Structures are given as structure tokens and as C-alpha cells.
């Protein structure tokens, strides 16, 4: 038998009381009339003096969650804010019996005349009040909010009710996502939807989640990127295309990583890595204009997004940090340098892998203000076109306060080179690199029909929202972050 707290039992007992008065505690939304929100009433009627508003006899319908009750005054919270209700018990003796059963958290409907109190607060003088939904559990901590971080994530609905900061963060996330879509739509990009289930591992260096399709009797992986299908669309004539959606990677779990997260990938024919850097920088600066500021604090560090983003070469930076010229170094010499910095040498490591490992160890932690780092080794960039020096590629990553925010290429359009890259990745996988790509013959086949020279970029939406809302944990910008199951 279910055990209820004292407060929960009191609320459930009221259900029997409602039956006697034909009160439906869980109504359907019929006959409510046109509803006004709190901000609509304040914007339209806030300028009127108390006497003027009373003389106008403006009748309105409102709905919201009861968050405060003191004497004859009730405060309801709707999607836009709060609105006060005045209920005179002497004028409504029969209705008073019902109103006195209301609890904080109940969802109410009110019809009445607009008025202002002596302090000038917009108020609805109730002529009728109905219970729409009875809250059978009390709100936490008398509506002062959830303070336990884990509880906030597990019960996001309560977090949104009780914590205005959290609610505002997710409202801003919605706006940022819409602004990003608007940015690309105005540039004549087409939005695409590509499969979540892939029968190959490609598009990024990451460990996948796997699943099995019973009818096809075939294993699939949840997508780790949208790159391959989007580039197939470029082959098909979608010369400007993007997709914003969920990505799944069976990897780390910390303040900047969640197993499922949101990215936008966009591809533009007749562009290159330079064009993608320009697109990305312009997008971020446009978002700053929408928000109304360009300086943000992330993990205690202020970053300025208004200035031109720096552009530095990976090989040059690694060479500076180590004092070794990595353009003219042998594998044996590179291994010795790596060992000096206590970098673990894997079986599949080449000079390119060592450069990448040293860059992650020595350079990444120094990239505070917005910086594009370009010129990655070919070994870690199997989908990127070669630069003039064929050991390196036309690839760039955007870093802000040591974190990667975007990854962009001049896309590899040569199908012969692409197949060789895939084969090299397979060799790495056989040597123990479980993040290496599979051979995607279908993609190679698509390239053989001809893909125009193309620039492509992927941006992590969650991290970008974290930056623009000055939030330090990814779980604070995900409505329902992945959490470890607990036994009830």
C-alpha cells in the first residue's frame, strides 16, 4: 500500500470533498474563454491609473499555478510571469468553500475585472474561480526552489516551476536555436533530416552506442555525426544544407559532455575552411547582437566575442611549446618528445597522432579567447582535404576558454583519396583505435559521382548555449540530462 506524507494525504482527502460539490479536480480545457497572460495585461493596461482602470470595467480570463496565498490575495504563475487575484469571500460565500480547499501548486482559472491595488499592482478581482488541476503533492521548500543539484536534474519539471534562473536559461536556449536556424535559412540553406540509425561508424572519432534491428536482423549504431549523409546531399545538388539534431557518443560524462547532445552541421558548396571559419565567427557575433552583449563569463573567466577571433597553426604552436620543429621531425624523435611530456604512445601512433596528443596536452589549455586552431595532421582528419603540405589538412577547430566549440574542414571530394583514408582508419582500428572510422563504401560511391568543392562545419549547440547563458555545466542546459538510474 502506498504511503503518503501528511500533506499528500490532506490533499487526497480533498478529492472526496470535491465529489460532494460536483467539483472536477482534473478538468478538460473547455469553456475557459480567451485567456490573457500576465504580461499582456500589464503591457496593455499597466499605464492606466487605478480609477481609470476601474471605470473601464475590463473583464478578463486568466489561468496559472497558485504560488502564493495570503488573505484575500492569490498569486498565479503563467508562462509569462505572475498575476495577482483578489477574491472577496463575503461576495462569494458558496464559492469560498471551494477556494478555501486550494493548495499551493493547484492550477486555477479565474474570470474577473481588472483593478489595481493601493500599491499599483495589476490585479484581477475574481468573479469566478475554478480548479482546473489539483496538485496532489506540495511544491518543494515552500516554493523557494530545489537546492539539490541532482534533484533538479531528475525532477526538471519542479526545477522549472521553482527556479526562475533555470526557466530563463531554457527559454534562452530555445531562442538561440531559433536564431541559428534563422541565420542559415536567410543564407538560403536547406534544413535536412538524416537517419539516427547508421550501419557504419563514420563522420567523427568517437565510440558509438549499438543496437539491433529485429526485422532486418542487423546491427546498427546510433549516429555519432551527421556529416556523411549531409555530404551525400551536397552530391545530390543541395549546395547549402544543414541539420540540427541529436548526436550519440558512448564516451565521457562530465560538465561539458553528455552521451546525447545537440549539434548543427552545415555544408556549403564552393566554399572551404576559410569560408567556414568566417561563417562560424559571423554566426556567433550575430547571436551576441541578439542577446545584447559580447562579453561572457565561463568557469570564472571572461571571454570577449566582439574582437576578431585569433587564427593559429597547430604545428607552429606545438613546435613553440616543445622547442622542436615538428615539420622536420622523425617518428623516433617525436616519440622521445612525447615521452618527455608523459604521453602514452599507442600501437597505432604516427607523427600526426603524437602532434595531436601534444597539442591537447600543451596548447589546448592556453586557448582562452576565441581562437581558430588549423592545420591538423591527416591521420586524425580522414574526411578533410589535404593542405599544400600533404601531411596536414585544411581543418580548423574553434576554442574558447580551452573548450572546443566547432570543427570545420575543406571537405575531401576525391573518392580515391577518401577510400585510402578509410583503409588507413581500418588499419588503426585493427591496432586498437576503437574511435577509428569504418569503411563507408556507399559514401565513396557517392563521391565518385562528383561532389563540388565544399566547406563544412559542426558546432556543439549545448556548449554554445552554456557560453551564451554563462552556465558552467552541460546538464544545466539540457532539459533531461542522462543520469544514472536509482532504485526506487
UniProtKB/Swiss-Prot annotation:
A single GO molecular-function term is: ATP binding
Q: Which reaction does it catalyse?
A: tRNA(Lys) + L-lysine + ATP = L-lysyl-tRNA(Lys) + AMP + diphosphate
Which GO BP terms, alphabetically? lysyl-tRNA aminoacylation
Q: Which cofactor does it need?
A: Mg(2+)
- One GO cellular component term, please give it: cytosol
Recorded hits in CDD domains, A to Z, give: LysRS_core (cd00775), LysRS_N (cd04322)
Q: How does it assemble?
A: Homodimer.
Q: What is this protein called?
A: Lysine--tRNA ligase
Q: Which organism was this protein described from?
A: Mycoplasmopsis fermentans (strain ATCC 19989 / NBRC 14854 / NCTC 10117 / PG18)
- Output the lineage of the source organism: Bacteria, Bacillati, Mycoplasmatota, Mycoplasmoidales, Metamycoplasmataceae
